[in-house]
């Protein structure tokens, strides 16, 4: 039997400091339909900055 497709989708979190740094993660699109924004560490500038969701190409 085929397994049901899950609700989790892979996303990319891109730094708002325009350093080109990004994290990849998953989110449940049913529980969190809006775009994710989270404060994380950017090792390029060595500061905590906002990361915004983008699609993985």
From Swiss-Prot:
GO-annotated molecular function: structural constituent of ribosome
Organism domain of life: Bacteria
- Recorded GO CC terms: cytosolic large ribosomal subunit
Q: Does the keyword Ribosomal protein apply?
A: yes
> Which GO terms are recorded in the biological process aspect for this UniProt protein?
translation
Q: Which UniProt keywords apply?
A: Ribonucleoprotein, Ribosomal protein
The cross-references to InterPro entries, in alphabetical order and at most eight, read: Ribosomal_bL33, Ribosomal_bL33_CS, Ribosomal_bL33_sf, Ribosomal_zn-bd
Disulfide connectivity for this sequence is none
* Xref: PROSITE patterns: RIBOSOMAL_L33
UniProt similarity note: Belongs to the bacterial ribosomal protein bL33 family.
Q: Which HAMAP family match?
A: Ribosomal_bL33
Q: Which PANTHER family match?
A: 54S RIBOSOMAL PROTEIN L39, MITOCHONDRIAL (PTHR15238), LARGE RIBOSOMAL SUBUNIT PROTEIN BL33M (PTHR15238:SF1)
Report what the protein is called. Large ribosomal subunit protein bL33
Tell me which species this is from. Answer: Shewanella pealeana (strain ATCC 700345 / ANG-SQ1)
């Amino acid at each position: 039997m085929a397994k049901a497709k899950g609700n989790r989708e892979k996303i990319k979190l891109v730094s708002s400091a325009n350093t080109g740094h990004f994290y990849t993660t998953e989110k449940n699109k049913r529980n969190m339909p809006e775009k994710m924004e989270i404060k994380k560490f950017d090792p390029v500038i060595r500061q905590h900055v906002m990361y915004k969701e983008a699609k993985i190409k």
